[in-house]
């Protein structure tokens, strides 16, 4: 008989609080010596149905050429209306010692409420951040920040009004990965910039940017980099979700002021390092990622990936080889959501995907890794993102047909679409119709690929004499990509059972298709209460889990990991609460809330009658 014990998860973590102080303008930095009430230009106020012309102030004819112009596209959304995250980052900019070598220009919009007295949510407004605080330069009719014409209009205006040697465009908002895109506008039904729309806007502007940055979640993807590679020299973005505090604006902007001759790689490195330091300070560093990508190296990476995809399609006619590939792929580091409660982003690390499958795609894997490491010129990552290599790629872990259709619009490889067609049994390339990315060529379909209809899986389950639960496959085992177990609590008095989680702690014989449980009479608990513990990712040195809870009455997911100290022992770490992805828009939450003393946590479990 196995003893029932429990493992307690420590809650000794702090919570970083966002505050919404008012700050504009800054009289202490008023170099002109005039009263601070005059440092903000008064734009003509008209009805919001009409465009407002440029306020008096600097234009192309009066502004001297700078070394850098930073164009911050700040879509406040719920990050600002609920927590003042945008205001906090603008506050950070007020601690910078400015000079004339760098123009820092901001467009605001996309939120119902700004947590300060200066910015008006009824307009698109444009500001300059300098020693005098924020100066209102221009305001326009309210429009969706998720509309490509809104973006291109701001960029063209900023480039014309503030000429410089180098330009940086920075996106501030939520991100949702390759399919969902970026810049979700709260005022316009979470309208976002998809990758095709992002490319459309940059093409309209026609400017080469030194840095294209994403202070958002999940946008350091191969598909995003490929979309913008014609229009920038470097991309700075995160594979994983970002905490609500975002980048360290005081630190990296001050570096730019002090080193205006720096190139995009140098500035990008400072953005990464200062961001990671900020995450360390707030306790969010374990899951942090940020990378600098040389966009000029992306075409070579896309070519190498297409060659690997060709090799991948070549194995789809042999089920055992395909099984080996998919088993390796699902072990790759994945980002964002990976449970029903969190939602699925289907973004995996390109490097880890390749490393985990290189025995199967041995002819092309090395070329992909070489091109990847050549493109990612700098990156930072936390201890539980140890396999993050700087760029993720879409992989169909759990997708709908509609998501596959959307991916076809942004895919970098026609051969990869053919591979997806095989592993997603109810989708075909023809379903995407004419919406396939026109930049790629989709090869003719092979008639030899395996299909799910060809395989019937038969198995037996039984409990051995010593009390272990066995699963033995009799037929169709070659089509199985993974085996995990569900753990249930049975209440015989009430005739109910509750799902307590999903894990992979099994004794596995993949050669013979035999598996049995490794249950040792223990299960994770939070302050003595068992939890629904769901495996998100199996890492080399850790397993990452998600626990559905309510925190102070709000549904969310507690992220935790089991980290191995030795081959046989380890410990739990709690990383905080993340609400996951919006089920309609695909927008990723940016708020990571750490548990603190006094929080009220309710553990959620699925219970059913038998």
Whereabouts are the PLM-identified features?
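Bacterial signal peptide processing site
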Residues: 22-25
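Structural recognition of the beta-strand scaffold that forms the well-ordered cores
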Residues: 69-74, 103-108, 167-171, 210-214, ...
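Positively charged n-region of N-terminal signal peptides that target proteins for export
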Residues: 1-4
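N-terminal extension/subdomain marker
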Residues: 52-163
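N-terminal, intrinsically disordered, polar/charged segments of Gram-positive cell-envelope systems
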Residues: 29-59
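Active-site groove signature of glycoside hydrolases
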Residues: 158-178
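Terminal, contiguous helix-loop blocks that mediate binding/assembly
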Residues: 50-63, 175-178, 182-610
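Bacterial N-terminal signal peptides
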Residues: 8-19
């Amino acid at each position: 008989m196995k003893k029932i014990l429990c493992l307690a998860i420590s809650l000794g973590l702090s919570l970083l609080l966002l505050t919404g102080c008012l700050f504009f303008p800054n009289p202490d930095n008023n170099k002109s010596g005039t009263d601070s009430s005059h440092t903000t230009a008064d734009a003509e106020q008209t009805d919001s149905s009409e465009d407002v012309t440029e306020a008096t102030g600097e234009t192309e004819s009066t502004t001297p050429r700078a070394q850098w112009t930073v164009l911050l596209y700040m879509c406040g959304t719920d990050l600002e209306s609920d927590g003042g995250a945008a205001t906090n980052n603008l506050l950070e900019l007020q601690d910078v010692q400015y000079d004339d070598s760098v123009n820092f220009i901001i467009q605001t919009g996309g939120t119902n409420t700004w947590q300060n007295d200066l910015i008006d949510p009824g307009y698109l407004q444009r500001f300059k951040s300098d020693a005098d605080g924020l100066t209102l330069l221009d305001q326009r009719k309210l429009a969706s920040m998720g509309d490509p014409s809104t973006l291109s209009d701001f960029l063209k205006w900023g480039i014309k009004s503030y000429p410089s040697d180098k330009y940086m465009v920075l996106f501030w908002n939520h991100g949702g990965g390759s399919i969902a895109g970026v810049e979700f506008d709260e005022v316009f039904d979470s309208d976002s910039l998809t990758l095709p729309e992002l490319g459309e806007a940059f093409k309209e502007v026609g400017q080469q940017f030194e840095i294209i940055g994403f202070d958002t979640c999940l946008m350091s993807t191969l598909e995003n980099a490929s979309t913008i590679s014609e229009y920038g020299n470097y991309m700075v973005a995160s594979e994983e979700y970002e905490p609500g505090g975002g980048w360290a604006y005081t630190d990296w902007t001050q570096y730019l002021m002090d080193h205006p001759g720096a190139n995009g790689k140098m500035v990008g490195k400072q953005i990464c390092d200062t961001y990671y330091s900020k995450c360390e300070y707030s306790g969010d560093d374990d899951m942090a990622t940020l990378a600098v990508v040389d966009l000029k190296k992306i075409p070579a990476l896309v070519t190498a990936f297409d060659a690997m995809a060709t090799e991948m399609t070549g194995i789809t006619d042999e089920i055992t080889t395909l099984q080996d590939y998919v088993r390796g792929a699902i072990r790759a580091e994945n980002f964002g959501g990976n449970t029903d409660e969190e939602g699925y982003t289907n973004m995996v690390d390109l490097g880890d995907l390749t490393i985990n499958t290189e025995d199967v795609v041995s002819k092309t894997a090395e070329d992909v890794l070489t091109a990847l490491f050549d493109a990612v010129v700098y990156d930072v990552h936390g201890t539980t993102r140890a396999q993050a290599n700087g760029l993720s790629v879409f992989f169909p872990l759990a997708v709908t047909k509609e998501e596959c259709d959307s991916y076809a619009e942004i895919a970098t490889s026609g051969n990869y679409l053919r591979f997806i067609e095989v592993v997603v049994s109810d989708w075909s390339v023809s379903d995407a119709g004419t919406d396939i990315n026109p930049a790629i060529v989709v090869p003719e379909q092979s008639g030899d690929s395996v299909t799910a209809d060809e395989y019937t899986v038969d198995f037996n389950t039984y409990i051995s004499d010593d009390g272990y639960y066995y699963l033995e496959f009799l037929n169709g085992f070659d089509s199985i990509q993974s085996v995990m177990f569900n753990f249930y609590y049975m209440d015989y008095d009430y005739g109910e059972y509750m799902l307590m989680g999903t894990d992979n702690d099994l004794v596995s014989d993949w050669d013979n298709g035999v598996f049995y449980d490794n249950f040792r009479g223990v299960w994770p608990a939070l302050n003595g209460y068992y939890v629904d513990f769901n495996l998100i990712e199996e890492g080399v040195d850790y397993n990452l889990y998600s626990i559905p809870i309510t925190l102070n009455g709000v549904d969310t997911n507690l992220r935790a990991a089991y980290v191995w100290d030795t081959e046989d022992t380890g410990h739990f770490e709690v990383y905080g609460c993340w609400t996951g992805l919006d089920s309609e828009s695909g927008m990723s939450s940016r708020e990571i809330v750490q548990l603190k003393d006094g929080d009220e946590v309710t553990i959620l479990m699925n219970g059913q009658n038998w």
